[in-house]
Amino acid sequence: MNKKSMITVNTEINAPIETIWKLWNEPKDIQQWNNINADWHTPVVQNDLRSGGRFLYTMGKADGSLSFNFTGKYDVVTKHELIAYTLDSGRTATITFSQGYPVLLTETFEPDDKPSVEEQRDFCRAIINSFKNYVESKLV
């Protein structure tokens, strides 16, 4: 695979880093926020959050017309700061969490060949926004 320019998506989240970290990594919470809209869901999540640990998210349309597994291995996990992983396809990604308030969550990933870079960016942005909304709704 040819190396492509990385895609970066970020958002500021108005919550303490401890809350953000927990909700980003707990399987029961991931199932709630890991979607692009109400037509999507993540019914299966396995998350062994440690360097060398593996993850599996089964994502798809809620009507069952489409699903896929998002799987890989954690390369680096630094609590409250960084998650770096390699997907089973060989693509890499990092997620950083700034210190302070609000927290800036930044996800940078190597795009796949399909769909388009714009579609992949929009998909990631929708999931990040879903996470932000989920976290901030928990604090109300």
Regions found by a protein language model. Give the residues of each.
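A short, structured loop/turn motif at beta-sheet edges
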Residues: 16-18, 49-50, 75-80, 96-104
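Hydrophobic pocket/interface hotspot
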Residues: 20-23, 30, 55-57, 74, ...
